[in-house]
From Swiss-Prot:
Subcellular location: Cytoplasm
GO cellular component: a single term: cytosol
Organism: Geobacter sp. (strain M21)
Protein's pathway: Amino-acid biosynthesis; L-lysine biosynthesis via DAP pathway; (S)-tetrahydrodipicolinate from L-aspartate: step 4/4
Function: Catalyzes the conversion of 4-hydroxy-tetrahydrodipicolinate (HTPA) to tetrahydrodipicolinate.
Name recorded for this polypeptide: 4-hydroxy-tetrahydrodipicolinate reductase
Amino acid sequence: MVKIAVCGAAGRMGGRIIAAVKEAEGVEICGALERPGHPMVGQDAGYNAGLGAIGVAISDDLNAVVQACDVLIDFTAPKVSLKNLEVCALYGKSIVIGSTGFTPEERALAAELARDIPVIIAPNMSVGVNVCFKVLADVAKILGEDFDVEIVESHHRLKKDSPSGTAVRMGEVVAGALGRDYNKVANYHREGICGERTHDEIGMQTVRGGDIVGEHTVYFIGMGERIEITHRAHTRDMFSRGSVRAAKWVVTAKQGVYDMQDVLGLR
């Protein structure tokens, strides 16, 4: 039985992850974390998950929770995730990170901290999105240089980072398949008289509003035709179920940084 702890247990994703752990086989919820001072600290973690009492109180003691678990699932923010990763490394515990918005420097630090433990860092835990990553690479290689690439992503009005980590990863996948450096060809802003579109650029547009769970479309636009590859998330449950699947996988992995492509055997 894999013992799972959840960080951000009082949040939307935290609640869905706890529910996913309770419905999955071979795993159990052994800990729930929140920041010190959060009003739900001390309350049963099952209530936020819509389960009623499950006998696991929300704690603000990171060290104690990590020591008691086999793997920590973290959907918070980069700085919090890095702190959690540091503590997991201290105690030799695995961690699954679904936080987005990491800078290149933060990614490098995460890789350094993962030298002694297995770590999964994935901007999207959905099986469907990760299949899209595979498809996008294949399509980009087939179409080559004859099609322009644009990405549009839409999320709820409360999302804090832009563009989404999933959209950035899609851009990285396409750029890599085309032999381009994503950081050099990504275009996040067009306004006014900005000139013609350059051949290599990958445009990135964001939409924020309402309660959109998540929608990503990659356009391959040629002369006289275009291909659109879209993924739409209807609920957060596929993220939470994917994170539990990742947690079950990572506890048997060797030290290092992995993503959902590794979990799903898509490499």
